[in-house]
Amino acid sequence: SSLTSLNLYQNFIGQEGAIAIADTLKVNSSLTSLNLGRNSIQKGGAVAIADALKGNTSLISLNLEGNSMHEDEAIAIAGALKVNLTIKSLDLSKNALNKEGAFAIADALKVNSSLVSLSLNENFIEQEGAVAIADALKVNTSLISLNFSHNDIGLHGSASIAKSLAYNPSLIHLEINQIRRPMLTGLQEFKDTFGNLKDLLNVLIGEDGAQVLGGAFCIKSRCVVVLN
């Protein structure tokens, strides 16, 4: 087959449809982009896709946004990421991976060397999950873009992400938010670690926060903080 891109976004293919797609991925060698966002693929579908990824060598971009996936599905996908060498872009946003799912993804990031873009926004990851991802960022050298917004990561989670950037040489695009005034004092001491970033988006810090942190994100005369 010569098909390289397949977009099934919001087509209600369900678990059975996802399993059928997974079976195809096991033998297909041409598809590079697959969008299965908002399809209610359920646990069986997600696990089947993850299993297929372990042997697939062509897929570069995979979107699994909004499929009501939980920690078990995240664990399965993380297992695939530990052995898959081709996936570069993975969208797991708007699911319910929770902190346990974040733990699994973090473990995968410590050994994965191909993923460059990861979306984990709106996954109820919270503070402990953020700390795990931060630890992974200290050793991961491939990730360039990370969307971590809307996860209620708190001061400790935010500070952990900030501190990890001092060790990470590759990340240049980071989306976080919900950094409120009580967190600003705690984050101020880490603002110098943000120097590698070219983009810091979705930071809900307001005018006070801009005065504290804003200057840290002006790189080569380009200020890219988005204040909502």
Indicate where each model-derived feature is located:
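Leucine-rich tandem repeat or coiled-coil scaffolds
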Residues: S1-N228
